[in-house]
Regions:
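A short beta-strand submotif of the Rossmann-like class I SAM-dependent methyltransferase core
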Residues: 87-93
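Conserved N-terminal segment of class I S-adenosyl-L-methionine
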Residues: 1-83, 87, 212-217
Length: 223
């Protein structure tokens, strides 16, 4: 596939949430360093993980069929030594973790002092089994649990908002239409792409109704 084809496919075929997630990861690419434990980190989206510039990139997954370096459950990481990891990468992971409190505690344990955890998590986004989907937490819940475990310098950023959530819902609806009607996405996606920009305006950010519709959160915290 050519670069132009990939760009077109990404523009018309990728959810607005995934595009946001790729951007957030790229904007914080400097956080990846040393030994990185990438839990559930199957390669998705257009973000290129900086595997070549870190000391070691360890791909861990609960399912062996994805060919991880280590098969493990984030809530039970006995195979990972205490304070041996510089960065724990948890992208779109914790909604699928049943024992989420234990998982966060384990991440804290394996991190070195000064180490970093990077989390992305959906909120107003469809239930999706991988293999199961257990929860959606608000920013207040995330702040409380991360503080209680011992994390510091917690930075929680909302991903998307009212118009991003609405646009993804419209896009998903289009995908369920008969083929001939699905062609309308070539007209609607450019319009929706403009619409999502409203989430970055004062119209939304300062509105006490419209600013309460995050699609998810991107979180960085330190041990």
């Amino acid at each position: 596939m050519s670069k132009i084809q990939a760009t077109i496919n990404n523009y018309f075929g990728t959810s607005f949430r995934r595009k946001l997630l790729d951007k957030f990861q790229q904007d914080h690419i400097q956080e990846y360093r040393g030994v990185v434990l990438d839990i559930g980190g199957r390669d998705r989206g257009s973000f290129k993980k900086p595997k070549a510039v870190v000391d070691r990139w360890i791909f861990a997954d609960i399912e062996a069929k994805h060919h991880p370096d280590i098969v493990l459950d984030v809530a039970h990481m006995d195979v990972i030594s205490t304070e041996s990891i510089d960065v724990v990468n948890c992208i779109e992971l914790f909604e699928h973790v049943q024992e989420i409190d234990k998982g966060i505690t384990e991440c804290y344990r394996v991190l070195k002092n000064g180490g970093t955890i990077i989390i992305s998590i959906p909120f107003l986004f469809p239930i999706h089994a991988d293999p199961s989907d257990y929860q959606r937490w608000t920013n207040h819940k995330w702040d409380n649990i991360l503080h209680s475990v011992g994390f510091k310098s917690i930075n929680i950023k909302p991903m998307g908002g009212f118009f991003t959530t609405l646009s993804d819902m419209v896009s998903m609806f289009i995908n369920e239409l008969p083929l001939i009607l699905r062609l309308s996405r070539f007209i609607l996606i450019p319009i929706l792409s403009l619409l999502v920009r409203l989430d970055n305006t004062k119209l939304v950010k300062n509105n006490n109704t419209l600013n309460k519709f995050p699609q998810g959160y991107f979180i960085i915290a330190n041990k």
